Regions:
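N-terminal secretory targeting modules
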Residues: 1-34, 38-61, 116-117, 167, ...
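Catalytic His-Asp segment of secreted/periplasmic serine-dependent ester chemistry enzymes
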Residues: 22, 77-78, 179-276
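Conserved SGNH/GDSL esterase-like catalytic core that processes O-acyl groups on lipids
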Residues: 27-33, 38-148
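Second-shell loop/turn segments in exported
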Residues: 37-41, 143-152, 194-195, 244-253
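Generic structural signal for well-ordered alpha-helices
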Residues: 107-111, 158-162, 205
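Serine-dependent acyl-ester chemistry module
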Residues: 128-152, 180-202
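A short helix->loop->beta-strand "cap" motif at the edges of active sites that frequently abuts
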Residues: 169-173
Length: 349
């Protein structure tokens, strides 16, 4: 854990320091944070509050625990139990669950904080709908209507909610907050034979990428900025369990280190939106055992690490924004390349 923390804080701290030396475009902005229990956190361990405080933003955290996005995530066998489902109206909830309906979790209530004074809406959802997302992924690219408004699908529910946000705040910037791990087997229930059933959170990240492209909104690719995985390419350990002791929430780390790392990563990702060091420029072209980067800020440090955390080689982006780093001369296996803030996993065969 110490090596993970040290490496992550060095990488993120370097970029955050650069950002602090520049003008802060987020200072004074009014931000509404929409999400699940992960951004809701607990008092004293809430990363949206840390992000807002450090960037000088005025925050309204409207994340709600156990909040789904889509009615399609409410399993038929559990439909009698009240669910928090953001895309449902209060009337729809009352019709399904009567007096016990959690109407506070309807978009009609949550979005009351979104108005003409709102500058930014952070949309931090996905994990709770992971099973539905996993089912939808296979057909997304072959379905021309996948992003049509439909509250029974995940993508369609997001389309509905984005539309509702824009009705209330046409000039606000919607930003998708990516999930923090693209390699975690997340529990979704029990099979008929009594064994546990899982889906990989890589699907959540893939859905967020697809949605960002379809909706033309920025995506904070947090999973690239944190080494949080069931099997870390940097350390070989289960860093997910270290980051989330309860297997779901970073705020379950009572030391507060995970929440601080999460906030650092989000600040870093928000900084990328304003400096040009964004996802497309930090994803290299791989050819003949060499990673080729372009569009990086001059002087950006690009480094190659072994899975045990050893630094093998470094290079800096030239005045044209290009950087090249070779890994083909090393033994077959998995390596990690950091480019500024991004973490890219590569395999040398």
């Amino acid at each position: 854990m110490k090596r993970l923390l040290l490496l992550a804080l060095i990488i993120i701290g370097y970029i955050t320091t650069i950002f602090a030396q520049q003008s802060n475009p987020y200072s004074g902005k009014n931000i509404v944070w929409i999400g699940t229990s992960i951004p809701a956190g607990i008092p004293g361990r809430q990363y949206p509050e840390l992000v807002a405080k450090r960037l000088g933003m005025n925050l309204k955290n409207r994340a709600i625990g156990a909040s789904y996005i889509s009615m399609g995530s409410i399993k038929p066998g559990n439909s009698l139990d009240p669910h928090s489902c953001l895309s449902m109206t209060k009337a729809e909830m009352k019709k399904m669950w009567g007096a016990s309906a959690p109407t506070h979790a309807s978009f009609e209530e949550v979005f009351k904080e979104i108005n003409s004074n709102t500058d930014i809406v952070i949309f931090d959802h996905g994990y709770n709908d992971r099973e539905l997302i996993d089912k939808e992924l296979a057909t997304l690219n072959n379905n021309p209507h996948a992003f049509d408004i439909d509250k029974n699908t995940y993508a369609g529910s997001v389309a509905f909610l984005f539309n509702e946000i824009r009705k209330r705040a046409p000039h606000a910037k919607i930003i998708l907050a990516g999930y923090f791990s693209d390699n975690h087997e997340a529990w979704i229930g029990v099979n008929a034979d009594g064994t546990s059933k899982y889906v990989n959170t890589k699907g959540v990240c893939q859905m967020q990428e697809w949605l960002a492209n379809k909706a033309q909104v920025p995506l904070l690719r947090v999973w690239e900025l944190l080494d949080v995985s069931d099997h870390s390419p940097l350390t070989g350990r289960n860093t997910f369990k270290e980051f989330c002791p309860d297997d779901v929430h970073p705020h379950s780390d009572e030391s507060g280190r995970s929440i601080k790392m999460y906030a650092d990563a989000l600040i870093n990702a928000l900084q990328q939106l304003t400096t040009g060091l964004n996802a497309p420029t930090t994803r290299p072209t791989l050819q003949n055992g060499t990673a080729h980067f372009s569009g990086l800020p001059t002087g950006t440090l690009v480094s190659l690490y072994a899975t045990d955390g050893r630094l093998l080689h470094s290079a800096k982006a030239n005045s044209n924004g290009d950087a090249h780093i070779s890994f083909g001369q090393y033994p077959a296996g998995t390596y990690v390349i950091t480019a500024g803030s991004a973490i890219i996993k590569v395999v040398n065969k």
